[in-house]
Amino acid sequence: MPGDYYQTLGVTRDADKDEIKRAYRRLARKYHPDVNKEPGAEEKFKEINRAYEVLSEPEIRQRYDQFGEAGVSGGGAQGFDVGNMGDFADIFETIFGGFGGGMGGQQRGRRRANGPTRGDDLRLDLQLTFQEAIFGGEKEIRIPHLESCQVCEGTGAKPGTGVKTCGTCNGAGQVRRATRTPFGSFAQVSACPTCNGSGEVIEQKCEACNGVGRKQETKKLKITIPAGVDDGTRLRVGKEGDAGLRGGPAGDLYVFLMVETDKHFVREGMNIRSNLEVSYLQAILGCRLEVDTVDGKAELTIPAGTQPNTVLTLENKGVPKLGNATIRGDHLITVKVQIPTRINSEERELLERLATIKGESHGKGGLEGFLGGLFHK
């Protein structure tokens, strides 16, 4: 399974086109098979090329940001932009960087400790029914997250007070400690324990958030599930993750979809499969039957002489294409012919006459054997 293309190129998700191009050129030179003969270099070179192919094109990159690999691959798992479906920025991928354990994530990249810091991304697993995945719709979710403190407006300082330079590190954010050893003196530099590397301390902490600047809250969100999503689809909801620190932007919310199985239907890409049991007479003579589809009842023609396991097609009754719901797959129905194990005397008489007409011997194997043979003529 492909990894995260941003990680492959070593750039952040907000990298511009020039940054992506520079990263690609640097890595392409490093891993080009003509230059690098180490095992795995050629495969790495292919990954780099694929990542650049996706991230260098704005439209493809947008789909990747929304659906991850599924948004840029073929078939029924292509990406879908929900930016036009409400206030949410966009939407998945199966596995990607930036998540830690539980609902929180790791901050991306190393930033100045006293500068604005982007909030963590959050992950939520959401269960959908088979029908919800096919046709989409709105779902209400509840998300525990860190929200910017309204009392101190995220500063962590008590209203009316501010911050001052840390007296321990004099604003440097680091402290230096010398250690004497038999081999000489060594200097060890570490983050200031007083200001945690920010270089500043709050004069008086905000009582509402205890000086943190953020509070744990649970919020309700309504998200739009587009038609045609599949098990493992990732929806990205922009800026609905944890609030940032010191004026930094909020992280994103990633919703991973888990689709329940259905007792009647099986999904294969954009197609839906199901079985239909018919009697041997219906298979021999043909008929029209009502069958279940995801859209409700539909009429299906069973041609005369239909063989067991014949697959019949109901066009445009399958899964809508992700991002273009006007295009749909088909519903493929496998015909299962029921051959009776017991028949009454009247049925036997009629079948014996039929066997005589066809010139079939039905002594060996009985009439049941004769019936089975009818479907292979």
Swiss-Prot record:
PROSITE patterns hit by this protein: DNAJ_2, ZF_CR
The organism's taxonomic lineage, starting at the top: Bacteria, Bacillati, Cyanobacteriota, Cyanophyceae, Synechococcales
CXXCXGXG motif repeat windows: 149-156, 166-173, 192-199, 206-213
HAMAP family (alphabetical): DnaJ
Name listed for the protein in its UniProt record: Chaperone protein DnaJ 1
Gene: dnaJ1
J domain: residues covered: 4-68
Function: Participates actively in the response to hyperosmotic and heat shock by preventing the aggregation of stress-denatured proteins and by disaggregating proteins, also in an autonomous, DnaK-independent fashion. Unfolded proteins bind initially to DnaJ; upon interaction with the DnaJ-bound protein, DnaK hydrolyzes its bound ATP, resulting in the formation of a stable complex. GrpE releases ADP from DnaK; ATP binding to DnaK triggers the release of the substrate protein, thus completing the reaction cycle.
Keyword Zinc: yes
Assembly and interaction partners: Homodimer.
